[in-house]
Design a protein with these regions (language model features):
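Short, well-ordered beta-strand segments in soluble/periplasmic domains
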Residues: 145-146
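Low-complexity, intrinsically disordered Gly/Pro/Thr-rich segments
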Residues: 155, 161-174
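N-terminal disorder-to-order initiation segments that are Gly/Lys/Arg-biased
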Residues: 1-70, 77-141, 174-189
């Protein structure tokens, strides 16, 4: 544990602590718990918030010590911060590591027209595969969908995100704070 003293005047950025909440209708959303002040430092390094996909730009934050876990997230202006590390910094503060991500609204589809549930998710790239089939080519697109831990999906489930239907292919659910799903779809060229 560091014995560093933090100047309160350096906590000059407004952030909001968020937690995932389920509505009576079954949709999940990030809701503000409380405002906080933070010292925010953007990094040129990538934050590897996903074990399966590629990372995102990182940020380091210092906040006053408060109740929070990696199940929470932060909002900094319009930017969503996906928490990846929380470490005590002296007696009064916490040092946070976060990934700057875009949160999409994801729907689980029973079929192409029936929505089962809605939740926030983060897409990250995995890789794209190309297969030459006679007489045409297809692209097998693959992404990784990172979800809050309460969201569990089965292989074969259809999810709609950014206007396209994707199939859940491979679940990665061992992390105690999030789930990751390899999703894919085939597109004719």
């Amino acid at each position: 544990m560091s014995r560093t003293s933090i100047d309160a005047g350096k906590l000059d950025q407004a952030v909001e602590l968020l937690e995932l909440q389920e509505s009576p209708a079954g949709s999940w959303t990030w809701q503000s718990v409380r405002p906080a002040r933070a010292q925010v430092t953007l990094s040129t390094d990538r934050n590897l918030f996903s074990q399966v996909g590629i990372g995102a730009r990182g940020a380091q934050l210092i906040v006053r010590r408060q109740a929070m876990t990696l199940h929470n997230a932060l909002r900094w202006g319009e930017q969503h911060l996906f928490l990846t590390s929380i470490v005590p910094e002296g007696r009064l503060h916490l040092r946070l590591e976060a990934a700057l991500v875009t949160v999409d609204t994801v729907t689980v589809q029973k079929d192409e027209t029936t929505v089962e549930k809605t939740f926030p998710g983060v897409l990250t790239e995995k890789y794209a595969r190309h297969a030459q089939e006679w007489p045409m080519s297809v692209n097998e697109l693959g992404l990784v969908l990172v979800t809050p831990k309460p969201i569990a999906l089965r292989p074969g489930t259809l999810v709609k995100v950014r206007g396209a239907l994707w199939e859940v292919l491979v679940p990665h659910e061992l992390d105690p704070y999030k789930n990751e799903y390899e999703i894919g779809r085939t597109v004719d060229l």
